[in-house]
């Protein structure tokens, strides 16, 4: 019998949190029992250290809080929760939100416009999310808003700005940049052939190195079968950085499903 650490009745608060139900989303089905236990331990600490702030009437219950915490902690399962030290609040809108955006064109003119955002990650500031896209992050589709924004936070640990190169040994930076830019070029070539909507990888990955790292981090965890065979060298670098192999988890899940199917009477 498995003794889950989060089932130990250390406090009324801990026993009230529905961790087992929170784990029952497609994205997390490939985790071993040991990985689930470790992830929940990190998520408990995350909820103790971070403040989840619902906005515009969004109702944040314990199950939603647990699932948000689990997704935040999945990328740092082996890195450690200290990798998420760069923020203290998570702001959660009920749906994509409108922000005022300021940008400068090629001749130096500054423009202001209102744009719809799914999420934002501020340097040494909060992470901003919306619940509709968080819900869409529970499956294994290649889209994951929380992992995308966490990747930006991990990226900025290597400097003042997100560059697409997380905090890795200096000797590995050149190889990482080479493989990341090769992936960007490959994605851009596909976009030019079939268009953004038909591309097999989110076209946003081709916009700049920081977004490429964030988008491919989404695919790394939620659609490894698309990432690994297409960019095998970069895949290995991601595995080394995150110290995880989601493709192995996927194969393990598929093997379990196949075994169960063959034993149905």
From Swiss-Prot:
Protein name per the record: Mlc titration factor A
Keywords: Aminopeptidase, Cytoplasm, Hydrolase, Metal-binding, Metalloprotease, Protease, Zinc
Subcellular localization, as worded in the UniProt entry: Cytoplasm
Main location: cytoplasm
Role: Involved in the modulation of the activity of the glucose-phosphotransferase system (glucose-PTS). Interacts with the transcriptional repressor Mlc, preventing its interaction with DNA and leading to the modulation of expression of genes regulated by Mlc, including ptsG, which encodes the PTS system glucose-specific EIICB component. Shows zinc-dependent metallopeptidase activity.
Assembly, per entry: Interacts with Mlc.
Gene Ontology BP, a term: proteolysis
Binding-site list for Zn(2+): 111, 148, 152, 211
GO cellular component, one term: cytosol
The protein's required cofactors: Zn(2+)
Xref: Pfam families: Peptidase_M90
Coiled-coil blocks: none
Entry similarity comment: Belongs to the MtfA family.
CDD domains per UniProt: Peptidase_M90_mtfA
Enzyme Commission number(s) from the entry: 3.4.11.-
Cofactor binding, note field: Binds 1 zinc ion per subunit.
Claim: DNA-binding is one of the keywords in the record: no
Gene Ontology MF: a single term: aminopeptidase activity
Organism: Escherichia coli O9:H4 (strain HS)
